[in-house]
Amino acid sequence: MDYSRYSMSAKDWGIVFIKSMSATVIIAYLFYDSPIVVIAFPVVFVYCAKLCRQEGVRRQKEKLNEEFMNVLKVLSSNMLAGYSVENAWQEAEKEMQLMYGNDSLMLSEIQEMNRQIKLNQTFEAVLSEFAYRSGLEDIVNFSDIFSFAKRSGGRFVDIIESTTYRMWTKYDTNRQIDVAVSAKRLEQKTMNYIPIFLLTFLKLSSRDYMSALYGNLIGVIFMSTCLLAYAGA
């Protein structure tokens, strides 16, 4: 699976259609006061679909990273208990099944990796291939550290344990930061709707004043500039 891509479901397409149609109607009414602008619906639809895919990729990678961090804890614990890395990874498959059920990105990855290992692929090779596909810095870093520790021998289990601890510390810190700024993000999203509310209020309460912005070239240019500035904000 390529985690830099997101396959939209029928539900996603339905949401995109509703959002893009609503946005097109709002643009036609508030910015141009002309139903002819509705012909721009395909452009708005493509733009909304692009945003949906980007958000889908972000959520997908966020979910994968969370599940991978839990796999690391299981892997480290199993190796400390005396399992080989291959057997520890097989045990991790069972743990992920219990934790997430079949609705798990990492479970399918672990199952495929275990199949590859049974076909005499090395764990380092399958881990490296997965890390490359994930596109996540934490997974790539762990893969590199794992390969280095495996080649160098010595305190292999200790290296994996300390690496897991450091990565979890970083992960927890990032989660706390996300929680701290989530209120600001919500506030920003709310602020994004204020220009639309103001424009709606002016159009409903001062139609004569706003009419100067519609039906002429200067008004079209001005409103188009405002729309582009709003879309880019």
What are these regions (language model features)?
Residues L30, M79, I117-K118, K150, ...:
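Hydrophobic residues in alpha-helical segments
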Residues P42-F130, V140-F148, R155-V157:
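Juxtamembrane/interface alpha-helical elements of multi-pass membrane proteins
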Residues M1-N70, Y171-A233:
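Hydrophobic alpha-helical signal-anchor/transmembrane segments
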Residues A125-I145, I160-D178:
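Hydrophobic alpha-helical transmembrane segments
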Residues D103, E124, E137, N141, ...:
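Hydrophobic alpha-helical transmembrane segments in multi-pass membrane proteins
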Residues W89-Q90, E161, V181:
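Short, surface-exposed helix/turn micro-motifs that flank interaction/cofactor sites
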Residues M96-M99, K150, M167-K170, L198, ...:
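A short hydrophobic/aromatic micro-motif that marks alpha-helical segments and, especially, helix-coil
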